[in-house]
Amino acid sequence: MNKVFIIGVCLFIVSQAVLAVPWDSDESSDERLSDRSDESREEPRKLVVSDDDSREDSNESAEVRRRDDSRESEEEPRKLSADTSDEDSDDSQESPLDLFFKTLRDSKISRAQRAALLKALLSRYAGY
């Protein structure tokens, strides 16, 4: 009885945290993309440099930034492909709690679907 109560309390706390978090990450990523595109549309800034040495330093730092940006853009698709391959592999061997948290990480699930999923878990494990 004590374990059931603890599991119920834990699931309730998780449910409150999950329902309180805005899961509209698609909109925020669209905003970030539009911000980046606005930045790229701006005219390039002209640097007025008196020394040739400082000009070389600024060119080197710009090259380093470009390399870092290209690395980040290359790493993101790799992470996404790794995540999708893990999900497709062995869904039948995962516990219901693993499926629950994996589903919660999916940004396309609605608030009502999260609540229904949580209710199903509570009814199965806590007897509510």
Swiss-Prot record:
The keyword Lipid metabolism does not apply. One of its GO terms (cellular component) is extracellular space. It is found in: Secreted. GO terms for biological process: developmental growth; intracellular calcium ion homeostasis; response to hormone; shell calcification. The keyword Ligase does not apply. Phosphorylated on Ser and Tyr residues. Calcium-binding activity is dependent on serine phosphorylation but not on tyrosine phosphorylation. Induction: Indirectly by 20-hydroxyecdysone. Its main location: secreted. Binds calcium. Plays a role in cuticle calcification. May induce precipitation of the calcium stored in the posterior caeca as calcium carbonate. This is Orchestin. It comes from Cryptorchestia cavimana.
